[in-house]
């Protein structure tokens, strides 16, 4: 898993 910030679905 890459330590990158992603927007999660609500």
From Swiss-Prot:
Any single GO CC term annotated in Swiss-Prot or TrEMBL for this entry: extracellular region
Record keywords, A-Z: Cell wall, Secreted
Location in or out of the cell: Secreted, Cell wall
Protein name per UniProt: 23 kDa cell wall protein
Taxonomic source organism: Solanum lycopersicum
